[in-house]
């Protein structure tokens, strides 16, 4: 039986830090679902469809990654996808408290759902989609932090 994992997030937009995490997850699991949350409560720069397309392009080189959008409760989505592992990236101690709360709630809702936390490579440990967008809005160079297709899409949005 295949070991299926879900790496959920808003990915607005997907960064090289996210790519680092999903790439490493593909070495641990047979199938990784990059699950892009609709996040209606967040004001996203990119639509769900745009985020899915950008992530599909950025992960096309990874053979065992499937990119899907979702708007369901994470535990329900995981159950429907026959996944028993959630992948989460932890950049700093500040991420841990929130992620721990999510992990406990998800486990309450779906007891067989395990959360696996991966630390990004040092090179990406300080970046976030929000920070990259903010720097780009002020004409800072963010080429190093984004896949090329995502960089081009971000520049087009900001033009």
Curated annotation (Swiss-Prot):
**Reaction catalysed by this chain?**
(R)-4'-phosphopantetheine + ATP + H(+) = 3'-dephospho-CoA + diphosphate
| Enzyme type, top EC level | transferase
Which pathway, metabolic or otherwise, does it act in?
Answer: Cofactor biosynthesis; coenzyme A biosynthesis; CoA from (R)-pantothenate: step 4/5
Enzyme Commission (EC) number: 2.7.7.3
Keyword entries, A-Z:
ATP-binding, Coenzyme A biosynthesis, Cytoplasm, Magnesium, Nucleotide-binding, Nucleotidyltransferase, Transferase
A single GO cellular-component term on record = cytoplasm
Residues involved in substrate binding: 10, 42, 74, 88
NCBIfam families, per database record = coaD_prev_kdtB, cyt_tran_rel
- What is the protein name stated in its UniProt record? Phosphopantetheine adenylyltransferase
Could you tell me which species this protein originates from? Shigella dysenteriae serotype 1 (strain Sd197)
Q: What is the lineage of its organism?
A: Bacteria, Pseudomonadati, Pseudomonadota, Gammaproteobacteria, Enterobacterales
Q: Which gene encodes it?
A: coaD
